[in-house]
């Protein structure tokens, strides 16, 4: 069974969207394997976003993601990575279609509500970072 990581970002937590987002995943057949509310450390975020280091949005992204609690979850199911990516919608808010999580709730590309692993390999790496007890 495939697993993936999804994170409701600080703006989604502050706006009370955890239940709505989780419901969308569960309605598509995904199961919640693990979850926690956490205010991520700079160290955790630097490891998570290491491939973005040096890009202009890197520091603001780290600041934003460490600004408050997030809801990190491991979801399990057939094609979990692909399903989460499709439900999340495009990263850029102007490209996110209505009916997707970002299309319905994102305010900007920076405050885009949700993270989802972009591949099976990324999911394994990210789950090990956020949920070392599952590794």
Swiss-Prot record:
Top-rank taxon: Bacteria
Enzyme Commission designation: 2.7.4.6
Alphabetic keyword roster: ATP-binding, Cytoplasm, Kinase, Magnesium, Metal-binding, Nucleotide metabolism, Nucleotide-binding, Phosphoprotein, Transferase
SMART domains in the cross-refs: NDK
CDD domains, per database record: NDPk_I
Pfam families the record matches: NDK
Subcellular location per the Swiss-Prot or TrEMBL entry: Cytoplasm
InterPro entries cross-referenced by the UniProt entry: NDK-like_dom (IPR034907), NDK-like_dom_sf (IPR036850), Nucleoside_diP_kinase (IPR001564), Nucleoside_diP_kinase_AS (IPR023005)
Binding site for ATP: 9, 57, 85, 91, 102, 112
GO cellular component: cytoplasm
Annotated GO MF terms: ATP binding; metal ion binding; nucleoside diphosphate kinase activity
Active-site residues per Swiss-Prot or TrEMBL entry: 115 (pros-phosphohistidine intermediate)
Cofactor: Mg(2+)
Quaternary data: Homotetramer.
NCBIfam families listed in its UniProt record: PRK00668.1
Database matches in PANTHER family: NUCLEOSIDE DIPHOSPHATE KINASE (PTHR11349)
Annotated protein name in UniProt: Nucleoside diphosphate kinase
């Amino acid at each position: 069974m495939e697993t993936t990581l999804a994170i409701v970002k600080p703006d989604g937590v502050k706006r009370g969207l955890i239940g709505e987002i989780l419901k969308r995943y569960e309605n598509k057949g995904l199961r919640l394997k693990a979850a926690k509310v956490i205010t991520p450390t700079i160290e955790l975020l630097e490891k998570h976003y290491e491939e973005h280091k040096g890009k202009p949005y890197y520091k603001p992204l780290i600041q934003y993601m460490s600004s408050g609690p997030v809801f990190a979850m491991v979801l399990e199911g057939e094609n979990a990575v692909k399903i989460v990516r499709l439900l999340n919608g495009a990263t850029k808010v102007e490209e996110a279609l209505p009916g997707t999580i970002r299309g319905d709730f994102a305010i900007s590309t920076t405050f885009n509500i949700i993270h989802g692993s972009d591949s099976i390999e990324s999911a394994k790496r990210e789950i090990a970072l956020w949920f070392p007890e599952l590794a």
